[in-house]
Every structure is written in structure tokens, then in C-alpha cells.
Amino acid sequence: MVMGIFANCIFCLKVKYLPQQQKKKLQTDIKENGGKFSFSLNPQCTHIILDNADVLSQYQLNSIQKNHVHIANPDFIWKSIREKRLLDVKNYDPYKPLDITPPPDQKASSSEVKTEGLCPDSATEEEDTVELTEFGMQNVEIPHLPQDFEVAKYNTLEKVGMEGGQEAVVVELQCSRDSRDCPFLISSHFLLDDGMETRRQFAIKKTSEDASEYFENYIEELKKQGFLLREHFTPEATQLASEQLQALLLEEVMNSSTLSQEVSDLVEMIWAEALGHLEHMLLKPVNRISLNDVSKAEGILLLVKAALKNGETAEQLQKMMTEFYRLIPHKGTMPKEVNLGLLAKKADLCQLIRDMVNVCETNLSKPNPPSLAKYRALRCKIEHVEQNTEEFLRVRKEVLQNHHSKSPVDVLQIFRVGRVNETTEFLSKLGNVRPLLHGSPVQNIVGILCRGLLLPKVVEDRGVQRTDVGNLGSGIYFSDSLSTSIKYSHPGETDGTRLLLICDVALGKCMDLHEKDFSLTEAPPGYDSVHGVSQTASVTTDFEDDEFVVYKTNQVKMKYIIKFSMPGDQIKDFHPSDHTELEEYRPEFSNFSKVEDYQLPDAKTSSSTKAGLQDASGNLVPLEDVHIKGRIIDTVAQVIVFQTYTNKSHVPIEAKYIFPLDDKAAVCGFEAFINGKHIVGEIKEKEEAQQEYLEAVTQGHGAYLMSQDAPDVFTVSVGNLPPKAKVLIKITYITELSILGTVGVFFMPATVAPWQQDKALNENLQDTVEKICIKEIGTKQSFSLTMSIEMPYVIEFIFSDTHELKQKRTDCKAVISTMEGSSLDSSGFSLHIGLSAAYLPRMWVEKHPEKESEACMLVFQPDLDVDLPDLASESEVIICLDCSSSMEGVTFLQAKQIALHALSLVGEKQKVNIIQFGTGYKELFSYPKHITSNTMAAEFIMSATPTMGNTDFWKTLRYLSLLYPARGSRNILLVSDGHLQDESLTLQLVKRSRPHTRLFACGIGSTANRHVLRILSQCGAGVFEYFNAKSKHSWRKQIEDQMTRLCSPSCHSVSVKWQQLNPDVPEALQAPAQVPSLFLNDRLLVYGFIPHCTQATLCALIQEKEFRTMVSTTELQKTTGTMIHKLAARALIRDYEDGILHENETSHEMKKQTLKSLIIKLSKENSLITQFTSFVAVEKRDENESPFPDIPKVSELIAKEDVDFLPYMSWQGEPQEAVRNQSLLASSEWPELRLSKRKHRKIPFSKRKMELSQPEVSEDFEEDGLGVLPAFTSNLERGGVEKLLDLSWTESCKPTATEPLFKKVSPWETSTSSFFPILAPAVGSYLPPTARAHSPASLSFASYRQVASFGSAAPPRQFDASQFSQGPVPGTCADWIPQSASCPTGPPQNPPSSPYCGIVFSGSSLSSAQSAPLQHPGGFTTRPSAGTFPELDSPQLHFSLPTDPDPIRGFGSYHPSASSPFHFQPSAASLTANLRLPMASALPEALCSQSRTTPVDLCLLEESVGSLEGSRCPVFAFQSSDTESDELSEVLQDSCFLQIKCDTKDDSILCFLEVKEEDEIVCIQHWQDAVPWTELLSLQTEDGFWKLTPELGLILNLNTNGLHSFLKQKGIQSLGVKGRECLLDLIATMLVLQFIRTRLEKEGIVFKSLMKMDDASISRNIPWAFEAIKQASEWVRRTEGQYPSICPRLELGNDWDSATKQLLGLQPISTVSPLHRVLHYSQG
């Protein structure tokens, strides 16, 4: 292929004066000869072709010189083609100018605008930047630029040209959503001073930030050239604007124009028509009706409409309408009949009220503003079309040509109209745009012009006046026939004329219908509109006329208003006043000039007055005692508060008590104890309760009233308090804990905000007796608090930063209590609970104890801190301040305070911009910027005034959505009262921007539209905060919370799907109905009343990706009670008050009306205070009653509320001296225990080696001589025992280096025939050798720290002597206790002091003769040394020392046989043991497999010891308590015995035990050693898996029947027959692989993981089994993926590794774990 002569050449063509034909030829010649051409000069250009050298700017000349671009004229192209070679450009200089040389300054104005400062040189120029390039009007080869764009920014500038003419330029920043190559275009269009010639320039940018910066700099450059900014567009400048900009300029033209007389008369007429209609109907002026009341009234209309359809009685309908007339007071009497026609009229009335209030927003202080103000308030361009013009005649002809009536129509006037948002949002791309007619009463025209045509709220056949409307559902109706539209255009009351609208309607694909369809709310699928075909002679339909219906407002664009009349209309003269001049309105502003003037109040503010806090003598009347009992389950709590106070006055008083709570609380009980009487409060509707209270006080009876005055204030009116009487008030409430990361916080406030107190204190309920007010719980009164805590996961820590606590706890349960002498000061009470596995979702289901009802609670706290980027580094914060007229007054001052405080919290990494908005908007910067100082931004906020007209927030949102951020996210903080114009468009823009923009709303003002702001935040993936003027003390925290969320990743669009198997069940009652967005460390609680539901699915979007998680529970795990019922009821009530029941405000209000009766019902059933209900109780008093009544025994009443569910444990943190002085029970009180004979039974134990934590020496350890031991008795508390015996205990220890519990014993350690040398290495073998030698008798156990993912063992219960008074318990180890056993009296010389589990002795006494060190058989002496560990946990192990050296009758007797080589003589103290093992047991898991994680009683037995090889180790007997749970009793109700053989080949091999009738204990081979490998591998199928058969269970020591039963209960049947069998095979194969893996790891063969056991590198080590393992591993990997997350779903464990280890007994398991039943299932 021959290359053209212009190959590798790129020509920039600037041939302004070349004829059009030659331009085309030039372009064609370049292409045909291998060249390329461009109209813009860029670094790739090799040549520039000019027909006049003067067209080059200085910047272009510099660029040409720098890039070595050749300059030539067009002849260079043509002569090079003629000679077929590339000629030298030196001979082809550009053409010189003609004879007339323009002045120097004219060259700049007639050529391209200089932009030297804008475009960087080629070294720094980005690839996406194209310099501004000039185009002449005659230039046709303009590069392709997207035409489907929107204008984000625009400006017009003017300057005087050289010849005295005006030069104008319009600069636009255009945004294209579809074009990736040209997303942002800066376009400028110049009109030269001759008024004829124009030129264009453009620049393309890739990001909104670059485009905004370029736009700003370009305007500045134009100013340097003498251009001045114009505020309004002139007609000439308007012609320069793009078509899209001209649509936006409708409002500009409207605001800058003066009114013609015709337009002024029209505005006055429609305004008078609307106001006159309202004045005729309403009892009070329209501007005194709240828009919130209008929304409620519209909701009532929808409710009445539904009731009408359901056939409610006329009486019931009238009752419902009464509420409507209360909200919207009417003149005259109410109509007796309620029908759809009445509802339609009232709906139109509500819309008219709403429209007029919105229109009047700009002139709130003027009841009758001038015509120009009314016109501008309409926000709609209206122009009069002169008669006899072509446009007038054309429109008149179009209207009349489809008039099928015989009555003539007289078209009086035509007005051209245009609305900005209709022009910008009109869906013309749907096609099939037709001009159609819409008729409406004159009084509705103001609203239509202001907000456009809306979808009707009540859509039904409205009777004779409107024949067809509603026949095609809820849409906007049009007709192409004037005769049809006239039916709806009624003559006005003002001048008797009618009005008609002509609209462009984008019908798109229209579906013809012949039958009515009332259910339509949108066009049928695949269509954009519907057409009701009119009936003709040949076609039978349901429609009299042609009806066109659309269901989207953006398919409509108004064009004309037709003013007309018909024969019979009475035309009246209407002469509006000539008051047309607009007076500038200047509201009064605060004169604050400093940021300090806008400071928010501190969170804690002291009261400025003591009013109401004193008695007649001025003395405070504080409470005497405050006692709190509480119960915390998961993250919810129930709290009971007891308050005691006395009337020290000699006269009866009315006392009122302010009870402070946070907004999460719900009071659910109120009781009073006075004069020996118990008064229980009842929930009644508020008016009824208050009336009952007043009557009781008047009659001299005692009365108690409690109501909710604010979210965090409850008021108790105690009523008549007799002189010297003591009253105990008992209040019960439920609440939710605050969550800070993985820490749950319970807080009990001591006082409330002073302004809330003062308001409640000053309210007067009765005037009979003196009123004394008690303002706070008290500062120095007696205070006590006891709470139980129960978690589904391990409690990491518990502490209070306000009080010193004592506590007792297990892994998942705890009881805490304040120390004696505590008081409650202004800090309140705070409790912090460290939670593990807090991010696991969970489900709680509670059955009601008295009725058929189930309440569900979902707990969901997403861990958003994982794998999410730091949002703050690339985020923008846009503070949008509402400056509309409705914000005037104190509301605007508060808005400024909030905006300024938010500004002060913006991070250094965040970009910031401030926008003031009203009808228009003003921004601080042209694009968000990093700011080093807040001064400029703060001054911008402080300078704002509420004079910007209406609340057109949609314009600001549209602008921001067009200039979306290129990186990171944008966060809008909206500060507004929520009375927005065009709410639907605003909502659409918020949803459209959600991928890159989040919206956080701050509601201000007592009349704020909270629903609108809440729904904007919900759809904008943000959160709404309402700033209540009554609770300013919380404003700082509210703002800080919002600003924290701005920098946090979020989880939005959260939804819950409840599993309801019965399709006929009613719709689930869920709260919140619309789940708000969640942010870092947020916790979601979703409640519901859903019957028979055990599973729910949570769906959410995180970074616009959908995530799902399934949570479930089982029938067995359902609890019984009322706490979750009360919480669910409170959540529904809260959602009723502050939630989103429906996106549409009217439907939301209708649902509120529907739910009101349910809310009252829930309130009464669950004893919950709401805005409709109160507690009231009346105490009837006798006249002869003693003036000094009996004081109630407060301590007894409080003691009845016992929350301590760990009574068997001792308090931690209690002073040691206090423990020593406690009364002790004598050991003789313990019951007599005997051992029943056991039948022959084999008991398998765990295979894991018994190991102990290697203790570390703590620096806190102090060695101290024991000295003389005082006599003591049984039932010692922990502190005293530890102090006396120098032993310590901790419940949970960190694992360290381990050693086997039973070690090889050297000969020197067994040289004597004493029990102790054998016992020492057996039990205390972790001790150093020196310790073993000197103190072989010391007993200590260590424990492992428990690790649990969800739940852990319930703490063991311990019992005092009174619980064993019923005689001997069968199955104990009494018969195995030796007659006498020596007791070790001290620890080793160097006892370890790191957390470990020691044995603690209790229940014994030593006589005074026992003060000397105890001598043991064999000559060993224990050294009397001790160590104390006050920081360690409470004891779990208890050894009892009998008080009597005689045989222990209470525990039976032991009679050694004659063959026994050793006989123990009675010694100073006999030893028995009452040992309880927690989950992290003192004994390793291997020792307690039968009672894994379960409390058992351990009796330490000793046998005679001969030689090492023939010796028998100590025997441990396990005994269950008679109060253990039923599911454990099967295994634990009888004793089982363990004997460990000390084998020299293996450190610790556990055995099967046979307990025979002759009490003989036989040691059997280790269960793993006994495994027949051949038999195990023979059970493998050809495909590589194992079946879960009893044969396999025997090999694995697993009860397969129990496992089958367990899986069936957990729902494995739902997988189907095939799925169930496959899953059982998978479980069996996993178990075998884990079994093989564990066995081989003992031989030193280590596998990477359970799923990768077929590693070829280890094949040589197990050639006999490798193929089987490989085949099984491959099958497992193929199959496991079919069952994702099946382990947690079936509650087997977190994953396969942990599940199989627990099933095989290789890993400890909690007693509360569902698998515990499997492991303890009877092997029968």
C-alpha cells in the first residue's frame, strides 16, 4: 500500500475567511492523501493552516513555537498534492491582512480570548485537557460534542466594544451523563460588538473539580479583559444560551421582568379566587394552619376512604371526619353524608391550603402582597400572547378544532407559561409528545402553576361533576377534546370566566384500553401511558370521551393557559388594586458578629433557679434512699428503681418527682408502698388517668400519676403525702444499652435538663394542697445497685467509671453490685461491659407466658471497620443552610449555631463547601476545597439571612448531582425546617445521587416537617437528627454524632425478611418499619410480633454491593417472658412517633391513624407509657387513720426483687476483713452422702492429654508464714479461705506453655510408700522440681482461657448447706472417701502467681493443736508459707475439711481391704473434696469429658500405692447436682469414676473405665490405641466418603443416634432426602478426617488444614492411608461448597474444624451449646 504524502501529518485548520466550498475541499484533500486534521491546536499537530495570521492568540503562538509546529497557508496543501511531495513551508507564509489594519486592541477582541493563565504548557498539561478553541458561525466541521447535556453553572458578562457596541458572552459548564469522553464541557458563546457575528469556544474536562476550577478561572480571565458580570440575562444574552440553559433562564427572566397589565390581572384573579374560596370555607386564616396538620388531615381522608370502601357505618365515618374538622376548622356545619365526592373536595381543599401556604412563604408578614410578589411566588413564567398574532390564532385554532359540543366557546385570552423544573425534567425522549388539554377549577390554578400537576391523593368517581376521572386509576388525566375538558373547568367566583391548560404530554408508547381499570397506579409493563378509547357507533367501550393518562409528573410540561367563557356564564368586572410595586422586605436579624455569639450550650448546665426545690423553710427535700435492681440480657435491660422519701412536714403536701431516663427507655411498671398498702399503677388513656388523679386528690385520697413529658423525662405526681409518712415508689423500665464498638454501656442518669424539670415542676394539676418539688434523685443519699448480666458470648470485662463495684461472674454471666455506702451524684451510674463476638447477628424469640403471642428481636451490628477504606481522606462535606423565609426568627439563629458547630468539627483531610439556598443558592467556593482556617467559612454562615424566598432545595441537589465527585464520597449536611418545595423531585434527585452522595438532615424549629427530612435521609443513606429546642443540652452530641457518621462507612437500604411458612398469616408487625442506615459501631435492633418464626434474612447495601445474612433460632431456644414483648411494643410505639411508616407523607399519616388504636392497646397490655397513656393509682384513705402511719419495711420490699442468679459464688472485690468476720456454718450441717452401688458400665473419656498451664511468677506475690491457723467452720467465702490457706483461684486464665498433668515419675519421687509422693506428680506436676521435692502434697490446678465464638457455658451453681438437708444423695463418692486423709496446709515454696486455678478449701476446722506443720506419712513436711493473690477471680473448687478426726459420717465411711498395702491412720485433718469444674476447668478437658463444661462435684480419692509400675493413680469421682438442667441429668445424675494409669510410654493416656458392681475399677486400653484402622478404612465408600453409621460411631466414640436427632431438630429435613443424605455423608467424612488428622499429628505428621489433608509432601509418611485420605479430601472439597455456612445454620459450630473437634471431644464446649446434648446423649 502506497502511503499518502501527508502521512504522519496532523493539520490544525484555522481558515476563517476561506469560502465554505474551499474549506470542504481542503478537508477532503488532506484525508485522501493520508493526513489528518483537527480544529483545535494541540501538541500532536505538526502543521497549522491559516488564511490570516492575525487569528492566532499569543498563547497559541507560544505553543506553536514550543512544539515546533509548521505554519502555512492553504496553498501549501494544494501545491504539495500537485507535485506529489511534501513541500517546504517557508514559501507558504499565511496571508497578510488587507489594507485596513485594525487597531491593536481590536485584534484581541476580534480574535480568540486570551487565556495564557489558564492552559498549562505541554510539560504539565493533562491528557484530558483541550484548550479553548474558536469556531466561526460558518464553520461546519465542529468536533462532535454531546447534545444530551445539562447545565450546572452559567454566567453572562458584558463589555463595551471599540465601536461603542455591547460585547456579550455566556459561559456554561455543561455536564453529560452518558458521554465518557466528554463528561464536562466549558462552553463560551460570544456576541461581538457589531451585534451580528458570534463565535464559540470550549474546553473539555474529565472531573467536576477540574471543570469547576477551569470555569472559575476562565471567568476571572474574562474580567481581566474588561468584561463585567451581569446579574440578569438580557434578551441578547439569552439568545446566546444553549437550549438547556434557556429552560433554566425561565426563572431568571421572571425575576427580572416587570408585569404587563394582563398578567397582573390574571395573577390577582387566580389569587383572589383561591383565597376567597379558603376564606369562605375555613374558620381561621390559611397562614395560621400548620402544614403538618394538613398532612395529618390528608391521612385521615385516606383512612375514611378505606373505611367507606369497607362498608363502615355512617356513625363511624362521622366520628373519623370529626378529627379532620378539628385539624382543618370549617365554617358552618359538617355535611351529614360522607361519600367519595366529599372526600375528593376535601382533598382538593387540603392541596389548596398547602399551595397557598407555600406560595405565601416569601411574604409571610404581608397578608396581601403586591402583584409582582404574588407573581414571583408562583415561580412560573407567564407571558401574555397578544391577540391577532400568528401564535394566538394558531393556539386558538388547535383548541377549537376538537370542540364537539354545539355550545360555542369564546377564547378571551391566551397566556404562555413555563415552569423551570418541568422544562428540565421533561421526558421528551419518550417520544409521542402531544399537546393535550386539562381542565380544572379556577381556585386550583395557583397551586398548579406553583407546583405543577400532581397525581391525585384520592382517586375515585366523584359523582355527576366528573364523569370519567378515576376510571384509569391514580394518574393525571388529559383530553384532546375541548368539550371533555370543559366538564372540569368551572367558572370562577371572581369574574365568571374559566381557565384551561394546554400541556405537552410525552405519551411515549400508549396502550389503548376499552374497559375501566381503577387499580392502575402506573402504566402497564412496556407502556408509558394509557388511552381510554371513547365509545363510537362501531366501537363499544366504557368511556364517553377520549382520556389520556400518565402516571409520572415529568411526562407533563405546561405551555398555555386559555381564558375562555361559554354561553350562560355571568362575566363580572374585576378591578384589582393598582398596588403592583414590590416593597423590599427586611426582617429583623440578630446583631451577632462573632462565632462565640453562636456557641451552643454545654451538655451539662446547672439550673439558674431554685424555684420549686424548697419547702416552706427553704430547705431541700431530697430523697432518702435509692435502690436499683436490674437485669441485662444481651444488649437490653430491665431496671427496677426503688425511691424512698419522707414528708417531714406537719401538713400533707403534693410532691412531684422528676424521673430521668434516656430516650431508649420505656417505663413498664409503677407501684407505691405507703401506710402498709401496696398501690399498683394501671395504664389508662391520658385524659382518663388525669381525671382519676384529680378526683382522688380532691377527696383526700392518695393518688399517684406518672406521665411522659419529654423523651427523657417521666413525671411522678405523688399526690397527698401525709405528714411524717414514708413512701416507697417502685418504677420498672426497660431500655437498650448503648454500644461503643464492642462495649455495651448501661447508664442511669442522676438529674435531668433544668428546663425540662422546670416545665414539669411548674405544671399545676390541683390546688388543694401545698406542692413540694423534688428535682433529682439526690446527691448524697443512700444508693445501692445490683444487676445481673447474661450474654450470648463471653464477657470480656465489666467496670464502672462512676462507682466501685463488687462482682461475681462466669464466662457469660455476671452479677455486679455497688459497695456499701455508695451514693449517686450528678454523674449518675455508668456500667461498661466488654463483649466478644459482638458482630455476630442473632435472633431471640420470646413466648408470652399467658397468651398465644411471640415476639422476636434481631440484633445486628455489622463490622464495617473491616476492609473498608478511610473515607475521610477523599470525602467532601457540603453544609447546606436553609435561608428561605420560613426559617425567619429564632429558628434561623439555631440553624446557624448548628452549622457553625458542624463546621468546627470538619476534619483536616476533608474538603468543604458551604451553600446557602432558598429560591436560588449561593456557594462559598465554586467547588469543595481543603481549608486551613474556618474564618472565611464561618463568616459566610454568619452573614446568611432568611431572605432567599422559597425552599427550592431541589435546585441545589440538581447542581451537586451534576458535578459529582470523581473520587471518594460526598456528604451533604442539610440544616432546614423541612418545608421543601417540590418534594417528589427533591426525593428523585436524592435517590439518583446515592451512589456518590449521602445526605444527613438536621431538623430545626417547632414546626419542622420531620417526615420529609427523615425520608430524605433514609433515601440518601444518611441519618436524620431533630434538634428539639427543649433539649439543647444534647445538641452538641447530636451534631458530633452526625459529623462522625460523615467520616464513617455505612450500611444502608437494610431490610428484614421474616420466614413465615403460613401464607395466610397477617402482615408482620415490625419496628422499625423502615430500617435506618447503619454506621461504624452502630447496632441495629429489629423487633417484631411474628408468630411461629424462627428465621429471618437481613439484606443491606455496603458500598452499593448487596450483602445478605441469615439468622435463626429453634423452637428449643425460644424463651418465655415479657421483656422482649415490652421492647417490641415500645419499638412499635417509637416507630409510630418518630419512624417512617410510608414514603409518602399522606400515606404515612393515614397509617398513623390506623395504628393509633393498636398503639393504645399495646400500651395497656405491656404497661408502657406513651403520648396517649399514663400510669395512675389511687389509695383510699380512712379519716380515722393514724397520723403517724407504719413505715414500710423498705429492705424487705427491695429484697423480694432478687436478681442474683449466681448465689453459689462469692463476690470479687470485697474487702478481705469483711469476709473473715462473716458467720460460718458448721460442717455438721452438711448432709450425709452415701454412694449407691453401680452396675457394670463403660464410660469413654476424651482423648486429649491432660495438661496444665505453665504458671508464671507474678511480682505481686508475697510470701508469708501461715502461723497459727485459727479455728474456722465451713461455708467460707472466697476471700477468707484464700487468706487463711494462702491459695488463690481465677476463673479464666491465659494459656501459656503446657506440661502434661500426669508426668513420668522418677524413682526417687516414689521411694516412700506414701500417698503424697504419688499425688504430687499426678496432680501438681507443673511445679518446679524443687517445689515437688519440698512440698509434694500441694494441690493446684490450672485452667485454660475459654475461647467461644457465640455462647459459652453457663456458670455452675453452688449450694449452701441448707440445700443438702434432705438426706443422702445416691450415687456419691462417700464410700470411696478414706477414713482419714492428710490435708496439705500450704502452697509450694515458690507458688506461681499468674492467673491459675487453685484448689480452695472450705468447710473444715482445725483445732488449736493443729498449729504445727502437719506431718505426713513418709516423713514429708509441708512448709507453712503462703501467698495471697487479691486480684484473682472467685473460687470454683472447694475442699471440705471435717471438724472431727473421726470417720466422716456425713460422707460415709471407707474400710480398706486387707490386701491394701497401705492403711491411712487418722490424721489431724481429713480431706474430702467438693470440686466444681467450670468450662475452662481446673482439670483439662480430658478429665471431664463426661461433664464437659458442666458443674460437677469432684471427690478426690486415694488408693494404696505400691511400686511405680504397679501403682494406681488417684481416682476422681464425678457427681452431678440435683438442680442441674434436665438435659444433663441423664449423664450427670450418677457418679462415674476415672482411673488414670501412669504409663512410662505415654505421658498421659486416658482410659475406658469399667465400674463394676464389686466397686472394682479396671483400666482399659486407650480408645485411640484401640482403633482398628483396617475397619475404619473399610467403611469408606468407593466415592471416598463415609456414612454416618453406628459402626462409625463406635470407632469415633460418637453417638450417631444423638447426632441424627440433633440435626433433625435443627431442620436438616428441609434440604430434601438427597440433600440430607449428602450432608450426613459430608459430616461423617469430616469427622473421620479430623480423627485421622489428630491421631497422626500425635505421631508428628502435621497437616496444613482439615480441608488440605492430601498434601503430597506427607504421602511417604502414611503410604497405607494416603490414597484414602486423598480421595476423601477431594470429595469433601467438591461437596462442601454446596452447603455454604451450614455449620452455623445447624448450630454445629463456626466452621467444620471447630464443629468436628467439638463432636470428637477434642475441643471444650459450653454447656449452653446445642452440641452439649449430642456429647451427653445416652449411649444406652
Curated annotation (Swiss-Prot):
The VWFA domain is annotated at: 876-1046
State the top-level EC class.
transferase
Outline the segment boundaries, as ranges, of region: Disordered: 97-123, 1408-1452
Ranges for the PARP catalytic domain? Answer: 369-573
Recorded family membership:
Belongs to the ARTD/PARP family.
Per the UniProt record, the source organism is Homo sapiens
Gene Ontology MF: a single term: NAD+-protein-aspartate ADP-ribosyltransferase activity
Q: What Enzyme Commission number(s) does the record list for this chain?
A: 2.4.2.-
Q: What does this protein do?
A: Mono-ADP-ribosyltransferase that mediates mono-ADP-ribosylation of target proteins.
Modified positions (Phosphoserine) in chain numbering: S1236, S1335, S1504
Query: What is the recorded name of this protein?
Result: Protein mono-ADP-ribosyltransferase PARP4
Q: What is the organism lineage in this UniProt record?
A: Eukaryota, Metazoa, Chordata, Craniata, Vertebrata
Q: Residue ranges of the VIT domain?
A: 607-735
Q: Tissue expression, per UniProt? A: Widely expressed; the highest levels are in the kidney; also detected in heart, placenta, lung, liver, skeletal muscle, spleen, leukocytes and pancreas.
- What is the top-level taxon of the source organism? Eukaryota
